[in-house]
Amino acid sequence: MAHFPGFGQSLLFGYPVYVFGDCVQGDWCPISGGLCSARLHRHALLATCPEHQITWDPIDGRVIGSALQFLIPRLPSFPTQRTSKTLKVLTPPITHTTPNIPPSFLQAMRKYSPFRNGYMEPTLGQHLPTLSFPDPGLRPQNLYTLWGGSVVCMYLYQLSPPITWPLLPHVIFCHPGQLGAFLTNVPYKRIEKLLYKISLTTGALIILPEDCLPTTLFQPARAPVTLTAWQNGLLPFHSTLTTPGLIWTFTDGTPMISGPCPKDGQPSLVLQSSSFIFHKFQTKAYHPSFLLSHGLIQYSSFHNLHLLFEEYTNIPISLLFNEKEADDNDHEPQISPGGLEPLSEKHFRETEV
């Protein structure tokens, strides 16, 4: 499988790092090579190991010092609770280049949310302004915006190692019918180009159902629909899920959805959608790195993150796709003789939960 060097093994010291919002949700101590504490460290700008009392920068892996030399205040769960002293510690170095985010982008995000007025308004693809990829070499930039009634994070990542789109996985299970539920009047060719650009940029392996979205730009892997229903299997589709998240797979095959925790005082990652976790830990929630150390999830599934489809509502098509490159006149895919059938209405039905 093609991917950027080092991504499959690690992003820091050979150990996995995953960024969700402004928090590092999983990282392994560079001294022990393991998870020393369930709350090893919480925030992406400074990382600490309470057992070994060291502090390092998870962005580039530079060890800053021990806790005795460089005292870092205990960070609260939410940015709104941070004090001026905390913010001073958390201020990242100024980058030479920052993405130019037009104000109209944020205005469009607030105005054209698909969940505006309490119901889904699938007009996202028509109204969002064009926003191209950020320049390579940038530190990760998080852009917070309103999505319905909640604040979510738009992810803008640099395109070069050591951090190469940590939230975009090696393997993406994609059902274009579910993508079509959020984007209206988007030609099939444009959806294909979007997937192609993601594939080129991230090196991810894109897996599509075998009987939908004929492609001419690239050859994605095809998964037989007869293996399992897409709505209940590889890519669970929950229309009621309001927070963006990622999917890991338990060793028993059950999907596990993660997202930010809504309550104060709890870990900032919540594991949902599987009774398996609650049988083991009752009401507690742990990061997959903790589950990994206890043998509850497979090692491969810890690295091969599967993109939850609501994530596409937080990464608009205009973010990943240049408007000029789209051929909006090409509404029908080119099908070679004896090729696959074009998408039918059955692929664009919403899934009931």
Swiss-Prot record:
Renumbered residue ranges of the record's region Interaction with CREBBP C-terminus: 312-319
Residue span of region Homodimerization: 116-145, 213-248
Chain positions of motif Nuclear export signal: 188-202
Zinc finger (unnamed): 23-49
GO CC terms of this entry: host cell cytoplasm; host cell nucleus
InterPro entries named in the record: Tax
Region (Interaction with CREB1): 2-58
Post-translational changes noted in the entry: Phosphorylation at Thr-48 results in the loss of NF-kappa-B activation function. Phosphorylation at Thr-215 results in loss of CREB and NF-B responsive promoters activation. Phosphorylation at Thr-184 and Ser-336 have no effect on these Tax functions. Phosphorylation of either Ser-300 or Ser-301 is necessary for localization to nuclear bodies. Thr-48, Thr-184, Thr-215 and Ser-336 are highly phosphorylated, whereas Ser-300 or Ser-301 are only rarely phosphorylated.
Stretch list, region Interaction with CREBBP/P300: 81-95
Location of the protein in the cell: Host nucleus; Host cytoplasm
MF (Gene Ontology): DNA binding; SH3 domain binding; zinc ion binding
Modified residues (Phosphothreonine): T48, T184, T215
Induction profile: Down-regulated by P30II.
Gene Ontology terms: biological process: cellular response to lipopolysaccharide; negative regulation of gene expression; positive regulation of DNA-templated transcription; regulation of mRNA stability; symbiont-mediated activation of host NF-kappaB cascade; symbiont-mediated perturbation of host cell cycle G0/G1 transition checkpoint; symbiont-mediated perturbation of host cell cycle G1/S transition checkpoint; symbiont-mediated perturbation of host exit from mitosis
UniProt keyword Zinc, yes or no: yes
Regions of compositional bias (Basic and acidic residues) in chain numbering: 343-353
Record's miscellaneous remark: HTLV-1 lineages are divided in four clades, A (Cosmopolitan), B (Central African group), C (Melanesian group) and D (New Central African group).
Role played: Transcriptional activator that governs the viral transcription from the 5'LTR via the recruitment of dimers of host phosphorylated CREB1. Together they bind cAMP response elements within the viral promoter and mediate high-level viral transcription. Increases host CREB1 O-GlcNAcylation to further increase 5'LTR transactivation. Also modulates the expression of cellular genes leading to the deregulation of T-cell proliferation, perturbing the integrity of cell cycle checkpoints, the DNA damage response and apopototic pathways.
Domain note: The 48 N-terminal residues contain a non-canonical functional nuclear localization signal (NLS).
Family according to the record: Belongs to the deltaretrovirus Tax protein family.
Name by which UniProt lists this protein: Protein Tax-1
Organism: Human T-cell leukemia virus 1 (isolate Caribbea HS-35 subtype A)
Gene of this entry: tax
